[in-house]
């Protein structure tokens, strides 16, 4: 009688391979999500820096900061609409979130955002409240504010 040789994988080999693939994909997925969150946080920080620069230019011309900011609108000189400080005030990359602008006096302001990366070194702990709009864990302040 001739011995019959079979080819293929046993059930245990298939289960082990599937388990290893599941572990690897979980690790890669969490790294992917972490990288996306860090990218959004980087954009938030850059957005706030851009807004601060525009607000400082506004203050240099008007000697006060604007009362409010409307996200998505432009920041223009109230006396001369052709003088544009910022063509579009950026908003948070997530549609259900918003930045917060708090002008505590004519010559000071704070801009707030919520960072997603819990390990970010710029993250405030504990978070700070802003204008009754919730708590934020990242802030930039006017240049004349400590």
Language-model-detected regions and their locations in the chain:
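Extracellular/periplasmic head regions of type IV pilus-like filament subunits
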Residues: 56-117
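N-terminal single-pass transmembrane signal-anchor helix
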Residues: 2-32
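Short, surface-exposed interaction loops/tails
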Residues: 106-146
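Detector for intrinsically disordered, low-structure N-terminal pre-sequences
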Residues: 1-2, 75, 138
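Aliphatic-rich helix starts adjacent to a transmembrane/signal segment
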Residues: 29-49
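A generic fold-level signal
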Residues: 6, 43, 103-106
């Amino acid at each position: 009688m001739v011995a019959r040789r079979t080819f293929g994988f046993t059930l245990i080999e298939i289960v082990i391979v599937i388990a290893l693939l599941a572990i690897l994909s979980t690790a890669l997925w969490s790294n992917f999500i972490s990288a996306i969150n860090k990218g959004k946080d980087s954009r938030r920080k850059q957005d706030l820096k851009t807004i601060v620069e525009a607000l400082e230019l506004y203050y240099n011309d008007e000697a006060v900061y604007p009362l409010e900011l409307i996200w998505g609108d432009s920041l223009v000189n109230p006396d001369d609409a052709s003088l544009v400080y910022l063509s579009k005030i950026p908003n948070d990359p997530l549609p259900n979130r918003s930045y917060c602008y708090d002008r505590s006096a004519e010559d000071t302001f704070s801009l707030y955002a919520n960072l997603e990366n819990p390990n970010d070194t710029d993250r405030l702990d504990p978070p700070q409240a802003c204008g009754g709009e919730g708590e934020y864990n990242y802030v930039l302040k006017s240049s004349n504010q400590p």
